[in-house]
Every structure is written in C-alpha cells, then in structure tokens.
Amino acid sequence: MRYYGSYYRGLGYGCGGFGGLGYGCGCGGYRYGSGYGGYRYGCCRPSCREGYGFSGFY
C-alpha cells in the first residue's frame, strides 16, 4: 500500500502535514490535487509523515 496514500484515504494526508491533507508529497503532488480528494500526485515518494507514501503512482 505505498501508492494508496491519497487514493486510499481520499484526502491524501501523509505527505506534508498541511492540516492533515498533505498536498505536495515529493515533486508536485499538490499540483495535481493530492489533498483535493485523491487525484494524481505527480511522483510522490514513500516519505510521508503519516506513513502513507506514494511511489510515483498516479
């Protein structure tokens, strides 16, 4: 469940700690709306704070 961060929870909190939303996890995740409801997050890497990492999935 590495690429299930935003997609799995629907919010995408874990990469950023922006109020529990986490837009911008690695390289431009926020640009695609990683915290807008589970869209594509560019190429986030498994380095989130909550433990939900995105391995460059979209």
Curated annotation (Swiss-Prot):
GO terms for cellular component: cytosol; intermediate filament. The keyword Repeat applies. Transmembrane segments: none annotated. Signal peptide: none annotated. Pfam families: KRTAP. Keywords: Keratin, Repeat. In the hair cortex, hair keratin intermediate filaments are embedded in an interfilamentous matrix, consisting of hair keratin-associated proteins (KRTAP), which are essential for the formation of a rigid and resistant hair shaft through their extensive disulfide bond cross-linking with abundant cysteine residues of hair keratins. The matrix proteins include the high-sulfur and high-glycine-tyrosine keratins. Interacts with hair keratins. Belongs to the KRTAP type 19 family. This is Keratin-associated protein 19-6. It comes from Homo sapiens.
